């Protein structure tokens, strides 16, 4: 602790696999980061990188990712950082996908047809572990609109699962959803009332705190009074807006254009 003001906000993400949940959490931070390449440590030599590995700060996950790119053994990273090997193995899976997408981009630039260099199976797996279209586009050099078209033509769309709030101890149905790819959609869109979709304010930061969540909650209540079906998208576990009984439906998702658009496509709010 010191005299410098620091934010204490947090994000929460849910997915059917850890890799996907981590990718969602990274882009939920809303700090111009969207993947494990968002901080560049490639300019460091190996000794400098190892010194960075020993430092505990908010960039450590990106430092570990750079070490994995350089072929540093997971066991050595564990010994230096004391991060459990299970988590390092999961980061390695994300780095392997990053390398596969970069290789597809190299093949495309060398003249190989896109459908051969970037098969649908690779796109499907990238989306399963929640690589956003923006990152896939950046790594493969395929325009983002074309990535989206390829996804839709292959039926690769986000599906929404209901959160089991009782850990399967007994049946529980709550209107509380998270996205994943490759599963059956459980968020049935209703059309008996007009709908309004409220975007939450995401993680608490310096200058953005509970007063913004107050606005989200009270606007939701106001629309409810007017007879609207209310839907909230947010990713902050500390807030009132992510209580599952505030709105008719809650989507626990990042607030990026792609994530929001996927929900809009299903719900079609007025």
Positions of predicted regions on the chain:
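ATP-dependent carboxylate/acyl-activation modules
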Residues: 1-270
